[in-house]
């Protein structure tokens, strides 16, 4: 199946852990999760007959955080409380994904060339839907690219980010976890079968 490469950049990003997303404070993972990359890609182009499998991501800019306070509603009292969000700042990634077939119910729409060309067309336009980096207030800009093109801040760096969320199964209430390791600026996403599974909350990215 065909692969697509694109660059995504934004002023802010916030990729949260759905198992610890409680209260008014949010802290971003240092890099996008596999499920966040899936959501990014589906915002560019998606149909029920296809799905996108994230393969790898290249981290181009330094990983930097910036904290901001926010007034959040307290629904029990009707008042407001102060929460702190810890965002990633000035992010830029190169992403490679592979097209795969989606639901069998839409097998009649399995036209590789049509979906590939539609994806490229919407990618050049900046996405069919608004593209966000983790949460809706973090707007993103996308464009086609050649994976590995240009210089990246971590091109000579290896780094271990520990175990992070890989993806989720909302119907089963399962969260998949996987170790995230960067080699020369690139993180390769493992297959779902290689992940550790946990039962937990299914909100956030």
PLM regions and their residue ranges:
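N-terminal, Lys/Arg- and Ser/Thr-rich interaction peptides
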Residues: 1-24, 183-197
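Extracellular structured ligand-interaction cores
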Residues: 3, 54, 90-94
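Beta-strand elements of well-folded, non-transmembrane domains
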Residues: 8-14, 61, 95-103
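Short, hydrophobic/aromatic beta-strand segments
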Residues: 17, 52-53, 106-107
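Surface-exposed beta-strand edges and their flanking turn/coil or helix-capping segments
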Residues: 18-23, 65-74, 108-110
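Short, flexible N-terminal segments of the mature chain
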Residues: 20-40, 117-130
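Glycine/small-residue-rich interface belts in oligomeric ring/scaffold proteins
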Residues: 27-67
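Internal, well-folded beta-alpha domain core
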Residues: 72-205
């Amino acid at each position: 199946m065909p692969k697509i490469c694109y660059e995504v950049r934004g002023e802010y990003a916030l990729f949260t852990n759905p198992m610890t997303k409680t209260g008014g404070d949010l802290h971003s993972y240092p890099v996008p999760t596999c499920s966040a990359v899936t959501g990014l890609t589906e915002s560019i182009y998606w149909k029920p007959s296809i799905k996108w499998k994230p393969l790898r991501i290249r981290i181009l800019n330094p990983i930097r955080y910036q904290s901001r306070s926010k007034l959040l509603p307290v629904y029990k009292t009707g008042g407001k409380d102060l929460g702190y969000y810890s965002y990633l700042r000035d992010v830029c990634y190169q992403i490679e994904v592979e097209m795969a077939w989606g639901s069998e119910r839409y097998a009649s729409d399995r036209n590789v060339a049509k979906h590939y060309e539609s994806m490229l067309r919407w990618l050049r336009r900046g996405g069919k839907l608004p593209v966000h980096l983790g949460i809706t207030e973090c707007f993103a800009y996308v464009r086609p690219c050649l994976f590995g093109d240009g210089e990246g801040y971590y091109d000579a760096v290896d780094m271990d980010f520990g175990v992070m969320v890989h993806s989720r199964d909302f119907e089963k209430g399962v969260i998949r976890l996987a170790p995230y390791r960067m080699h020369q600026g690139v993180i390769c996403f493992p297959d779902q079968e290689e992940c550790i599974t946990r039962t937990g909350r299914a909100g956030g990215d």
